[in-house]
Amino acid sequence: MDKAEHWFAVSLAGASFPFIRPAVLGWIILMSLSVVQLRSQEMVSASDTLASEAARLLSEYIQVSSVTGTEREAGEYISDKCREKGLHVEIFTDSIDCYNFAASLYPLELQKPNAVFLSHIDVVSGGTDSLWTYPPFSGAVVSDTVWGRGTIDMKGAAIMYLMATSSFVGRASMEDLPFNVTLLFVSGEETYGERGAEIICDYFMPSLNAVVMLGEGGIGTAELLSDEPDKPVFFISLSEKRALWLELEVNYQASGHGAVPPSDYATRMMIHGLYDLTRREPEITFNNDNKGMLRAYGELEKGLKGFILRHPVFFRPLVASGLRKNPLMASAFTNTSTLTHLASEETAINQIPHRVKACLDCRLLPETETGRFLDNLAATLGHDEVSVRIVSETRNAPPTVPDHFYDIFTESLEEVYPGCGIVPFLFPATTDNNYFRNQGVPVYGIIPAVLDQRLMETIHTHNERLPVEALLKGTEVYRGFIDRLFMKSPEEEPLPETEAGDAPIDVSELQDIP
C-alpha cells in the first residue's frame, strides 16, 4: 500500500466511523506514516545493497585482466560467480585464449527454448597507465562509478545479466517456466570471434537452443532531441557493418641516403596514398536499415527537422550535410577506412627505408562488396607500388526483423525509463552478433544504460568507466524482460539437432579451428 492508499484508508475510516476519537485517529495516521516510512527505508536499503553488490562484482571482474588471448582467468572468475548465484554452468571450451561457457537458469540438456544474453570476456589493452585517472585494471569504485578497462565494453553488461537472471533462480527451482535464460560468455570478440562466437556457432548451437539473443550494440543517450534534450533515446541494433582489416605495404628499392632523396621512395609513396585516402570525404549511402533509423528518429523529433528526417531520400542533400557534422551518426551511412598503424623497417635517421607498412581498419556497409571496395581503395591510393593484403574479414548477416521478443524488451525499457524514445538502427561497428544472426537467431544489440558522449568516448581508450546507477537501471530492464518473457508461451521451434560435445573440451580437439 502506498502513501496515497494509506491516506484514503484513514479518511474512509474517519468518515465511516465518526465515533472514533481524534486521538485515536491521530494515532492511526501516525502509524500509517510510520509504515510508509519503514517500507521506503527498506526499499532504499535493498537498492543500496544491490548497488553495492553490483559495483563489487564489476570491480572484481575488471581486476582480472582479460586482454584478448588471456581470457581464461577472468572466465573462471565469472563462471564461479554464476555458480555461487545458483546458475547451471556448462564449460564449452577451456584454454587460456579460448574460454567459452554458458550459465543458465535450467540445465541446457532440458532443451527449453532459450533466451540468451551474450557477452565477451576479452577486452582491449589498457594502453598507457599514466593516461588513466585510476589504473586500467584497478576496478576502482569512486563517487559511485566503477573505473577500468571493460566497464562499458562489456563486463558491465555481463554483471547486469548476472544480477537480473540470478534473481529468478528461486522461482525457476519451484516452477517449470516456459523458457530457459542463459548467459553466454565468449572469448576473442575484439579479434572478431574466431576463438569464441565462431566456435559456439560451429559446435554448440544445438545445446543452446536459442530463440532470441541480446548482445552489445546500441546504448541510450539523453542528448539527442532538439526540443527534449533530457529525454533518453535508446538505439537497438538490428544489423551491423562488417569489418575488413587491411595491411598496406610499399617495398621499393631506391637510393638510401637521406641527404640526397630520390624522386620516389617507399615512405613518400605511402604517405601520398594515405594523404589522399584520409582526406577523402566518404559517400553517404542510404539503405533500408539506416533509412529506417532516420525515420524512427524523425518520429521523435518535432517540427521541420522531424519532417526532413522522416523523408531522408527526398531531402538527401540536407540530411547528408547534417550527418557529416556528426561522425558517429555518419558512420552508419558510410564505408570508413581508419589508419591505425604506420611503420617502416628500423633504420638510422639518415637512412631511407625500403619497406613501409600501414594498417587500415575498414568498416563496410552490409551491401558493400569487398572486391569493389578494394578497387576503389586502390584508385584512391593512386600508386601501383602500394600492395594491399586482407588481414581479416567478417561476414555479413541478414538483419534481424523485430518480433515479439523486441516488443517485450521495449516494454521493459519503457517501464524503467518512462517516456523514452526507441530507435532501431544499423550498428556502425562489428560485434559477435552477426555470427548468431547467420544461424537464424534474432539478435538485438543493446546495453540499456544512458551514457553521455563523454563516457562513450572512453571505450577503447583511457578512463573507461561506468556509473553504478547505469548498472542498476540495466539490471532492472533485463529483469523486466525476463519477467515478461515468462508470461509468454514459446512461439518458436527449437533449432534442428546436430552433433555437439557433451563435456568440456580443449580447443585443440576441434580439427577445423586454426
Segments the model singles out, each with a brief description of its role:
Residues 198-203, 258-281:
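A short core secondary-structure module
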Residues 87, 110, 124, 221-222, ...:
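An extended, acidic, His-containing surface patch that forms the Zn2+-binding/catalytic region
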Residues 26, 98, 134, 178, ...:
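Short, solvent-exposed loop/turn segments at the edges of secondary structure
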Residues 146, 152-235:
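Acidic/histidine-rich catalytic neighborhood of metal-dependent amide-processing enzymes
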Residues 229-233, 251-258:
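Flexible glycine/proline-enriched surface loops and loop-helix/loop-strand junctions
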Residues 121-122, 277-281, 379-386:
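A common structural junction motif
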Residues 1-42, 508, 514:
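Bacterial Sec-dependent N-terminal signal peptides
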Residues 42-149, 170-179, 360:
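Acidic/His- and Gly-rich active-site-bordering loop/insert found
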